[in-house]
C-alpha cells in the first residue's frame, strides 16, 4: 500500500515538474487598468515559483479583437510549452478574444489554467448605460463590446477550453451602492455576469471591483487554483 502511494506521489510530482519546466503565467489587467494594479498578484505567483509577465495593453484605444490578436501573436512567438493566464475584469475577455485566433491544427502552447477576477463574461449593465449616454470618443471602442445584449461582442466570444476558475466580488445589491445593477455585484460586474457556466470552480469574495487584484484572499485563491485546479472548500469568503 505504501509502495503504491509512493508511486502516485512520484507521478504527480513528475507531471507537475514537466508542466512548470517551461511554463509562463501572463497576468492581464482590465479596462482602464495598469500593470501596477496587478503587481501583488505577480509577486504572489513569483513567490510560489511561477514565471510571470505583467502584460499590458491600450484598453482605451485598441478594441478587444485587436488586443486578443496581439496576445495570441505574443504567446505564440514566445513559444513556451505551457502557459496560464490570470486576469482582472476585461482582461478575461482579452483571453477569450485570443481563443478566436487559435486554430486546432496550428502550433500554440498548451493552455494549462486560467483564473479570472471579476470578469464581465456576459457584459455589464454599466456598459449599456455608458454607451447610450456618454461619448464613445471618451471611453473608446470597448464599452460597446461589453454590452449585455445577446449579440454583443462579449457574448459571441468563445469560452476557454482549459480549466477556468472565476472569482467574483460581492458588495450587496443595495441601491445606494450601484443603482444600475440589480443583482449581487462588486459595483461593476454582477455575479451572474461573471459566471460563464463552463468554469471548473467559482469563488465569491467580499470586494469592490477595482480593488480585487490587491486583495490577499483573491491572491491566495489564485495560487490555490493554479496549483490544484480548484479553490478552497469554503468558497464564499467575506
Feature names for model-found ranges:
Residues 158-238:
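C-terminal catalytic-base region of ester-bond hydrolases, centering on the histidine
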Residues 39, 66-67, 123-130, 175-180, ...:
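Short aromatic-enriched loop/helix-cap "lid" or pocket-rim segments at secondary-structure transitions
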Residues 34-40:
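The serine-hydrolase catalytic nucleophile loop
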Amino acid at each position: 500500500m505504501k509502495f503504491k502511494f509512493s508511486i502516485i506521489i512520484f507521478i504527480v510530482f513528475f507531471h507537475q515538474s514537466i508542466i512548470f519546466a517551461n511554463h509562463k503565467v501572463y497576468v492581464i489587467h482590465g479596462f482602464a487598468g495598469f500593470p501596477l494594479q496587478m503587481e501583488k498578484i505577480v509577486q504572489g505567483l513569483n513567490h510560489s515559483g511561477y514565471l510571470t509577465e505583467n502584460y499590458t495593453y491600450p484598453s482605451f484605444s485598441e478594441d478587444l479583437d485587436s488586443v486578443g490578436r496581439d496576445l495570441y501573436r505574443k504567446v505564440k512567438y514566445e513559444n513556451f510549452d505551457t502557459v496560464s493566464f490570470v486576469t482582472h475584469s476585461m482582461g478575461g475577455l482579452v483571453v477569450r478574444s485570443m481563443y478566436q485566433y487559435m486554430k486546432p491544427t496550428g502550433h500554440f502552447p498548451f493552455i494549462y489554467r486560467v483564473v479570472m477576477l471579476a470578469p464581465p463574461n456576459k457584459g455589464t449593465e454599466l456598459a449599456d448605460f455608458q454607451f447610450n449616454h456618454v461619448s464613445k470618443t471618451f471611453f473608446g471602442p470597448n464599452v460597446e463590446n461589453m454590452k449585455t445584449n445577446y449579440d454583443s461582442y462579449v457574448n459571441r466570444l468563445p469560452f476557454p477550453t482549459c480549466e477556468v476558475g472565476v472569482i467574483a466580488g460581492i458588495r450587496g445589491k443595495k441601491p445606494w451602492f450601484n443603482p444600475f445593477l440589480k443583482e449581487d455585484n462588486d459595483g461593476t460586474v454582477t455575479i451572474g455576469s461573471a459566471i460563464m457556466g463552463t468554469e471548473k470552480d467559482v469563488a465569491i469574495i467580499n470586494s469592490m471591483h477595482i480593488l480585487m487584484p490587491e486583495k490577499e484572499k483573491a491572491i491566495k485563491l489564485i495560487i490555490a487554483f493554479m496549483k490544484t485546479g480548484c479553490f478552497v472548500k469554503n468558497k464564499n469568503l467575506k
